[in-house]
Amino acid sequence: LDGLREATAGANRITGQQKLEGKFDDVKLPYLGYADYQGGGVELKTKWDKGAGTDKPAASSLPKEIMWSHLTQIAGYWHMTDVWPTIVYANRLGYRVFKPTLEQLQAGVAAIREACMRRERLLAAASSPEELLRLCDPQWDHMYVWRDLPPAILEQAHKIWRS
């Protein structure tokens, strides 16, 4: 809570999650995001204990700078709202608050725009959902995307990508 208090200091009212929608130059489809607090002005990232289910849990470390995936997220919110974002990283021992630079935000917006344009090209190139999936890397080794899916879903995914 201390990190959120610091990030929202001076606010007369604190607002929770809000759906944001905007556009990027040369991108036809809308860009969507769900901001945590203050209409995109404050994003909270929690770092949970490692080994939480054991008798020796260890607090995950807090980053020393904004992580790239989180920077692109808040840069998208900034692009849509013109609200300068703050990001709070918190674990059970403490927190860190970061405000990105203009250069960081601009780099994040450029990366989002490029990714959106690439996705639109993939959508245009595919004639079916299955073909679209085959154009993408399934990332079978991703740490959580495929982890807890029912076997029937995994089997269907393997059929799509391996055909």
Task: Describe each model-derived feature in a short phrase.
Residues 32-34, 71, 82:
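Extracellular structured ligand-interaction cores
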Residues 16, 33-61, 76-77:
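Conserved catalytic cores of phosphodiester-cleaving nucleases, focusing on short active-site segments
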Residues 22-23, 48-50, 93-94:
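Short, catalytically relevant binding-site loops at active-site mouths
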Residues 64-66, 76-163:
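Metal-dependent nuclease catalytic regions and adjoining charged, substrate-binding loops involved
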Residues 1-40:
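Metal-dependent nuclease catalytic cores that hydrolyze phosphodiester bonds in DNA/RNA
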Residues 59-71:
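A short acidic, glycine-rich active-site loop
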Residues 18-20, 44-46, 89-91:
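Short, structured patches in soluble enzyme cores that scaffold and shape functional sites
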